[in-house]
Amino acid sequence: MKFSERIIEWQNLHGRNNLPWQTNDPYKVWVSEIMLQQTQVSTVIPFYENFMQSFPDVLTLSKANLDEVLKNWAGLGFYRRARNLHQTAKIITDKYHQVFPDNYEDLVALPGIGESTAGAILALAFNKKGTILDGNVKRVVSRYLNVENNPRELKKSIKPFLYQNSPKTNYRSFGQGMMDLGSLICCLLYTSDAADEE
């Protein structure tokens, strides 16, 4: 069984399949990916649900006052994310007529959307090949390749590995599976030094 097939099978059996942003709506995937930067899933869920109540689509977000967006973001921190979200919503509304671009180049040109977020939108919303490079995915790959203690080797190896081991279809399940495996099973290891610092 191929690496990608194992990840997809694991995802279908054990992964998180009921998160509120698990949809093919790129707006919802995008908002969740921005919120999840530096923030745990359990923390994001109530903020995401409240944000969607106030801004259910990209047009509503683009027309909102920035102060209103920041008020709805309060408690998540990293307010630059909210400002970029608002600015990008305006661009998607004006330039793309409220339709999210479904290609890497156009996505990474938008404020606040980097390589990993673009990969997540492509894979999770459009079911297209997209490379998700969040901490969970990096941890899975680093342990699989046995380069966990060699960040330089991981940086050199991760993209070729993911490219070569991505499935031919079902990018959504593969991407979600890699993130879930890293979050639920292949977790961060805490050393006694780290515990002493807390």
Predicted regions and their residues:
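Catalytic cores of DNA base-excision repair glycosylases
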Residues: 3-189
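Single conserved hydrophobic/aromatic residue that forms the stacking wall/gate
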Residues: 190-198
